Amino acid sequence: MVGAMANNGRIRSAFPVTNGSKDLTPNSAPASTTGSEYGPVEFTREDVETLLNERIKYKSKFNYKERCENMMDYIKRLRLCIRWFQELELDYAFEQEKLKNALELNEKHCVDMEVSLKNKEEELNMIIEELRKNFESVQVQLAREQTEKLAANDSLGKEKEARLSVEKAQAGLTEELGKAQGDLQTANQRIQSVNDMYKLLQEYNSSLQLYNSKLQGDLDEAHETIKRGEKERTAIIENIGNLKGQFSALQEQLAASKASQEDIMKQKGELVNEIASLKVELQQVKDDRDRHLVEVKTLQTEATKYNDFKDAITELETTCSSQSTQIRQLQDRLVNSERRLQVSDLSTFEKMNEYEDQKQSIIDLKSRVEEAELKLVEGEKLRKKLHNTILELKGNIRVFCRVRPLLPGENNGDEGKTISYPTSLEALGRGIDLMQNAQKHAFTFDKVFAPTASQEDVFTEISQLVQSALDGYKVCIFAYGQTGSGKTYTMMGRPGNVEEKGLIPRCLEQIFETRQSLRSQGWKYELQVSMLEIYNETIRDLLSTNKEAVRTDSGVSPQKHAIKHDASGNTHVAELTILDVKSSREVSFLLDHAARNRSVGKTQMNEQSSRSHFVFTLRISGVNESTEQQVQGVLNLIDLAGSERLSKSGSTGDRLKETQAINKSLSSLGDVIFALAKKEDHVPFRNSKLTYLLQPCLGGDAKTLMFVNIAPESSSTGESLCSLRFAARVNACEIGTPRRQTNIKPLENRLSLG
């Protein structure tokens, strides 16, 4: 069998150890680079070191063409060397695999031989045992016959007649004994032959083990050779990287020299085409800049018109007030006229004419009041539009404040004592006053919603901001406030109640309706949804169908969801489930699925307290087939976990860890806002998963709006004051003008340098 193995599949010899100037190629198959312009090439250690230490000499320092050609030749030789090393590595891998296969085959053969020998040994032992039993039975029978023979001899005189029969029996027994002895001798011979075969198999097994040891040694030597080859290859790759850096620098110098040399410009037609295309793009950029300047001037003109409208509105309000006074005077006159009608001696006809005139005057005044009210509404719409435009130009984060109604069991008189709303024209609908320890704290935001405001009223104020996502902007809306202040109600609403739907389902309904209406203009949109939560500084995928991937007993997701921001400002979360959606009904189903997976818990401050930050992301990709314009918008809707004090929440155990993680991440958010407000060079976005995820939204690339939710009861005055102060600081942050992500489909074949 060994001979058969040697003849049929000869094991490839091990690679030689490379020392000094010996060849780096294996004995069996020397590596060569086939198909290169240099023909088959083999490298030694001296060749590689000479190639890496080679210094190119140039006839002229400024002859860039010669330097470029020499460098290209040098790079080709380096690539040839690398290719040779790669082939050498493949040979090593092939030899290693072949040795492994041969070793496995021999080991398997040895195991099979050992099993067969053990089986044969057991069979022979059984045969020997059976022969021994037969021999013992024959000996017993022989002893019995000899006893009978002695007894027969003693009674020979008396039993002469039986002597003949005894002799016959003795002769038969002697014959059987001879046969038994012959069988025993045959069995001994078979045992001897089996023992000889066993010794031969043991010797063959020993030779196989020696051969296996030799193969293992050859394999170890091959491993060492491969390791040394890998180390040398790593060193060569590092040197090649350095050479690539030098080559890149030389390429930059060459490009600079090409730009100043007219003869090379004529030879490099591709460079001329690239410059021409760059000029076209530069002209487009200039046109965009001019268009933006025109838009800025237009906005300035609209701002001037807004001021004029404001003055006109003030005049209309004054006129309205005077007209209201006139109406009251006319009404008084009408009453007096009616009284005079009763006592007057004038004719009924004259009194009726006067009454009709006064009635017509009242109708005219009412129509003028209605016109003034319509102009006032239009002026308010224009004011909102200009205010949003000014905020976008300034780059501020918009802040809306919402005060939730009192809950059953809370003191109904608390709100009037702690929270009030100014009635001045400047602060109407935008101001809120908080009383603490008989001290009044006044705040002004972009919008303030009283407890009577409905979900529809709140959504109306942000509908234009949501529309920006379809226009190609990044939009971020997040709710902030203490636990139990109504953040989740604002964002999600109350399931099953159409009137109390939250901002997230309303935003999606508006986006799907607008997408449908824009189809007539040639727009096609694709929408993708993802939902995650940040629980104890760990990201969980709420749309994952694998429950173990969403949550484990320890509360830590086994998957690693790393956050990455690319050069375009887009955010990617590794291993996060992203689903295409076609209707708001699909998104509602996904929201219900995410709500079931989200972490909630009971504390002393809230029966259903969110124990994690919930992030809903809608990615919008739109293309207009007629204009070939593309837009990419993102809508982030975030329900932050509520801040809480341990003394009030009474959290212990896991709830305590959750509270500490929530407060830490919100504190990191405060540090980021503080750094942005002070315009510091370093903003600590990486201090928490929440701030790092919100970096594009807080860094100036997005339109960002924050809801600060306030609880009206007096026991929450301290937390409400902290929330309002934080919101005021957020409102004062200037993070930059948001960028619209839109472009024209790029050309298929764009010329590039080099």
From Swiss-Prot:
Organism: Arabidopsis thaliana
InterPro entries per UniProt: Kinesin-like_fam, Kinesin_motor_CS, Kinesin_motor_dom, Kinesin_motor_dom_sf, P-loop_NTPase
Keyword Coiled coil applies: yes
Keywords from the named record: ATP-binding, Coiled coil, Cytoplasm, Cytoskeleton, Microtubule, Motor protein, Nucleotide-binding
Protein name (database record): Kinesin-like protein KIN-14N
Domain notes: Composed of three structural domains; a small globular N-terminal, a central alpha-helical coiled coil and a large globular C-terminal which is responsible for the motor activity (it hydrolyzes ATP and binds microtubules).
Gene that specifies this protein: KIN14N
Sequence segments annotated as region (Globular): 1-45
Amino-acid positions noted as binding ATP in the UniProt annotation, renumbered to this chain: 481-488
Claim: Cytoplasm is one of the keywords in the record: yes
Residues covered by region (Microtubule-binding): 74-86, 207-754
Region annotated Disordered, chain positions: 13-39
UniProt subunit comment: Bind to microtubules in an ATP-insensitive manner (in vitro). Homodimer and heterodimer with KIN14M/KATB (in vitro).
Assigned GO CC terms: cytoplasm; microtubule
Segments forming a coiled coil: 85-209, 262-394
Biased composition (Polar residues): 16-36
Subcellular location: Cytoplasm, Cytoskeleton
Domain Kinesin motor stretches: 396-733
Organism superkingdom: Eukaryota
